[in-house]
Amino acid sequence: FILVFFFFINKLYSEDIMIMKLKDGDVELELYSDQAPNHVARFKSLAEKGLYDGVVFHRVIDGFMAQSGDVKFGNSNSKDFNLSLAGTGGSDMPDLKSEFSDIPHDRGILSAARSSDPNSANSQFFICFQAAPHLDRQYTVFGKVIKGMELIDKIKKGEGANGSVKDPDKIISLKLK
């Protein structure tokens, strides 16, 4: 019984761990399927299809966050790649309804990027460099960096107030552990 229980818990846990390969190494992400099941399901689905592989970090604001996930215009491996449009696209799937929680936007938090409409998240996400309490309960938190945050800190920073990156770093691959 104990062995079966351990196997079940380990399998359940491993299904919520993803590996994001960056140029400097691997980052482990723990997904919060209990807090944001629809956002986690979307993230996993796009990752399993390889749609995040090659996607750039198009918006990176030092001391705030690194944003990626535009699978339409931000995929450097795609014929549709257009850095000037990166950040305006998403997947072909419908937008997601918000799944706000009381989890604070602390350092390492993985959260869904969206427009001014709280129900407009699709494929884009951001990772916080430090606490951003002004985002709490306004953006859907769906995971956290549990290993390799120092690699997120190394992502090339953008310029100006919007944090646009001219020669951006990219996600090499994103897969379940």
Regions found by a protein language model. Give the residues of each.
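Cleavable N-terminal signal peptides
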Residues: 1-2, 12
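Cyclophilin-like peptidyl-prolyl cis-trans isomerases
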Residues: 8-177
